[in-house]
Swiss-Prot record:
Localization terms from the record: Cytoplasm
Main location: cytoplasm
Listed InterPro entries: Aldolase_II/adducin_N, Aldolase_II/adducin_N_sf, MethylthioRu-1-P_deHdtase_MtnB, Salvage_MtnB_euk
A cellular component annotation (GO) from this entry: cytoplasm
HAMAP family assigned: Salvage_MtnB_euk (MF_03116)
Listed GO biological process terms: L-methionine salvage from methylthioadenosine
Residues that coordinate or bind Zn(2+): H120, H122, H200
Protein name, UniProt field: Probable methylthioribulose-1-phosphate dehydratase
Record organism: Caenorhabditis elegans
C-alpha cells in the first residue's frame, strides 16, 4: 500500500485552518476520536475490526487504524497528519499497524465535498437494505429523522417531507477499489451526504464531526425502519414526494456549487 502522505487527494486537500472546529460544540481531539470509535463498536457499526473514521481538526487530519479491534483502540493507535506540510505526525508504536484502507476514500470525499469528517460503518441494516433494494439508489420520505440530514445545497437540514436519496454502489474486493465508484457518486449526486455499498456498509460525510455523527445515527435508524416497512409492504417514498420531485428536478439541476452555503 502506498504511504498515505503520497496520496494525490491528500496532497491537494486544502482546509481553512483559520476556522477552528467550525460549528462543533466540542473540538475533536484524539481522546474524543477514540471514544467515538468505541461507541460505534458498541452500536454494532464497527465489529470485527471493521469500520473507520477520518476527521479534520484545525490543521490536523486523524484517521483510524486498519485491522485493529475498535473497542480496544487507544489514543496512540490513531494516525495523525499535518494538513499544512502534509506529513505524518503520529502513528501507532506497533509498526505492523497500518492506516485504514479507507484513508484514500476519505481524502477524496473531503477534497471534493469540503467535508471535515467521514464515518464508515458496517452496520447490519446498511448491509441488508442494499440486498432488499435492487436499484442503484435508496430513497425514503416523510420521516421525522430526515430532519437530521444536512443538505449541502442549502446549508440547512432537510425537511420532514423531503426525499432522502442515498446512492448504492457495488462492493469490491478491497475498499481502495471503491475509489472510482465513489468518485462517480460525488460527480453524479452532488447533493449526496452518504453512499451505501452493497453487501458491505455505509459511508457518511459532513461539515463537522458532530453533524456527521448525527447524520450517521439518523441514517442508520432510517435504514432499520425501511427494512421493517418493506416487510410490511409500506412504501418508503410517499406519493406526494414523487410529485414534488418532478417540480424540483429542473431547479436542482441549475444549482451550482458556487451557490452552496459553506460546508
Amino acid at each position: 500500500m502506498v504511504e498515505f502522505v503520497n496520496d494525490p487527494n491528500f496532497k491537494d486537500l486544502v482546509v481553512d485552518t483559520t476556522i477552528d472546529n467550525r460549528n462543533d460544540e466540542e473540538p475533536m481531539t484524539i481522546r474524543n476520536f477514540t471514544e467515538l470509535m468505541i461507541q460505534f463498536y458498541k452500536l454494532g457499526w464497527m465489529r470485527g475490526s471493521g469500520g473507520a473514521m477520518g476527521c479534520i481538526s484545525g490543521s490536523e487530519l486523524m484517521i483510524s487504524p486498519s485491522a485493529l479491534q475498535k473497542e480496544r483502540i487507544r489514543e496512540q493507535d490513531v494516525f495523525v497528519y499535518n494538513m499544512k506540510d502534509k506529513t505524518e505526525v503520529q502513528r501507532p508504536p506497533n509498526k505492523r499497524i497500518t492506516v485504514s484502507s479507507c484513508s484514500v476514500l476519505f481524502s477524496l470525499i473531503m477534497k471534493e465535498t469540503g467535508s471535515e469528517c467521514v464515518i464508515h460503518t458496517h452496520s447490519k441494516c446498511a448491509n441488508l437494505i442494499t440486498q432488499l433494494i435492487k436499484s442503484n439508489v435508496f430513497e425514503i420520505s416523510h420521516q421525522e429523522y430526515i430532519k437530521g440530514i444536512y443538505d449541502p445545497f442549502s446549508g440547512k437540514a432537510l425537511k420532514y417531507s423531503d426525499t432522502l436519496t442515498i446512492p448504492i454502489i457495488d462492493n469490491m474486493p478491497s475498499e481502495s477499489q471503491l475509489l472510482e465508484p465513489i468518485r462517480g457518486v460525488l460527480e453524479n449526486y452532488p447533493q449526496a451526504i452518504a453512499v451505501l455499498v452493497r453487501n458491505h456498509g455505509l459511508f457518511v460525510w459532513g461539515p463537522t464531526w458532530e453533524s456527521t455523527k448525527i447524520m450517521t445515527e439518523c441514517i442508520d435508524y432510517l435504514l432499520e425502519l425501511s427494512i421493517e416497512m418493506l416487510k410490511n409492504n409500506i412504501p418508503l417514498v410517499n406519493e406526494e414526494a414523487f410529485e414534488k420531485e418532478d417540480n424540483l428536478s429542473d431547479k436542482m439541476r441549475t444549482l451550482m456549487f458556487g451557490d452552496m452555503a459553506p460546508v
